[in-house]
Amino acid sequence: WELQPGAKPPYGNWSVETREEFAHAATARMGCVRQACETGKYNAAILLGGGEPGFLESREIGREFGVVVTANAFSQMYLATMLGDSFSIIDIEGVHNVFYRDLIRTHQLQHRCRSIRSIGYSLPRPGDTDPDTLTVQCEAVAKGDQNIVVERAVDQAEAAIVEDGAEVITLGCSMTFFLQPHIEKGLRDRGWDVPVLEGYTASIELAK
């Protein structure tokens, strides 16, 4: 495996969230995919990022070279359908939920998705002044500190099971992927033996 650093985003140095930013990211990464395929060194390419900008286009490029292309949302959803009859998504708040809803429809899995639930945090944006960001919460979790985002994520995952009928939990934005082991443990502690997926591992496994 090799990690390609990707192209510098033309809109600025922050995470994609709006449709315009997703379009810029899609265009930039298609060039990276074609370049990787043309080397002849790889038999698979994995697109990182929960919103998977440019996935369908990159998959089309990959077919020209016999290279498998996987992405985080697609991989989680289809593995989820192998593990249960239905799944729910734990995501950040805001417009990303709407974009992710459209991904579910694109992949024709709206009949298997029970809900998209929010943890109440959005991605850091230019001009944000709130000191309590998802990045801060992620760093706190890494240090082993007790924090609200893990509790919220476990609560939403349990609600997806109890109220929505989900049999598998998946994660939306890649900024939430760090929550996977904490959600899995939190659900187990509450008596739920339910698979919890995250995009990076799912994409690698599907590529294999």
Spans of features found by a protein language model:
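N-terminal beta-loop-helix "entrance" segment that forms/cooperates
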Residues: 2-27, 127
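Structural beta-sheet core signal
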Residues: 88-91
